[in-house]
């Protein structure tokens, strides 16, 4: 600036004090201040580059927060992002996979699941209409997952156990639909290897309100600490279902008022615990 300029053209705060704004990179702030000080009508290429670069990550977090994988989408995803370094998978927080029906995913989907390192919620969805998808027993699920939802008719309880066994931080569990039959010998001690927090919300609906499924949860060595339980079924109340609710007694805050068996509200739907 020339010496004849007024003091208003030379703000001392700009020259002597670092100005910061939360969420905005300092180099962008410095570039803006430099542009104002130069009193130029032309925006530099560096300014445009810095600003556009700063919005990449927030846009990715918004666009890829929830990803639903069906048959055609998997191929497009892998074609667009063949390498981990280029993939926005780490931005995904809610991952939903269609494992049943005519739009079910191809089995190669399981190869890229380990890329979703920050996923918090996993949903497995789909009903009858296609052969059973060959789900591998171990497919590198991110340990960041705290919520698991299974709403399908195309899995066995053993497969669900194998999935849960990969999630040491599992807190919320929702199981609905129906289970495929499996050799009863495979269900002995099915829950003893499971580890998780199990301190959030539990939902059991339909064909999952059955002895083998509830026994699996009761066998978990770390115990059950769910603070909210919702059970929806129309058949007879099972002894293991009562034990399941009682196992959460010390931590239970809310017991769903929609728990019904044969159309009647079961006595323990009025929670005896504070």
Question: Which positions does each model-derived feature cover?
Answer:
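Secreted/extracellular small peptides and ectodomain modules produced from precursors
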Residues: 2-3, 46, 57, 263
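Hydrophobic regular-secondary-structure patch
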Residues: 17-108, 112-115, 127, 131
């Amino acid at each position: 600036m020339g010496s004849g300029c007024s003091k208003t053209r030379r703000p001392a705060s700009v020259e002597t004090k670092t100005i910061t704004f939360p969420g905005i990179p300092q180099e962008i702030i410095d570039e803006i201040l430099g542009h104002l000080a130069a009193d130029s009508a032309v925006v530099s290429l560096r300014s445009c580059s810095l600003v556009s670069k700063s919005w990449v990550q927030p846009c990715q977090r918004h666009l890829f927060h929830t990803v639903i994988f069906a048959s055609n989408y998997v191929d497009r995803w892998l074609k667009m992002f063949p390498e981990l370094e280029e993939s926005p998978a780490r931005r995904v927080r809610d991952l939903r996979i269609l494992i049943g029906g005519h739009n079910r995913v191809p089995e190669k989907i399981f190869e890229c699941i380990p890329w979703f390192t920050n996923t918090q919620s996993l949903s497995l969805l789909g009903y009858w209409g296609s052969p059973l998808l060959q789900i591998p027993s171990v497919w590198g699920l991110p340990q960041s997952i705290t919520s698991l939802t299974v709403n399908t008719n195309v899995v066995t309880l053993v497969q669900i156990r194998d999935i849960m066994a990969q999630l040491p931080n599992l807190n919320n569990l929702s199981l609905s639909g129906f289970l495929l039959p499996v050799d009863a010998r495979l269900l002995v001690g099915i829950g003893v290897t499971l580890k998780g927090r199990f301190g959030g919300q539990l939902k059991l609906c339909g064909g999952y309100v059955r002895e083998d499924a509830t026994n699996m949860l009761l066998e978990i060595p770390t115990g059950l600490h769910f603070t909210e339980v919702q059970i929806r079924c129309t058949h007879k109340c099972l002894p293991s279902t009562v034990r399941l609710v009682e196992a959460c007694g010390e931590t239970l805050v809310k017991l769903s008022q929609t728990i019904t068996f044969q159309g009647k509200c079961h006595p323990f739907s009025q929670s005896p615990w504070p």
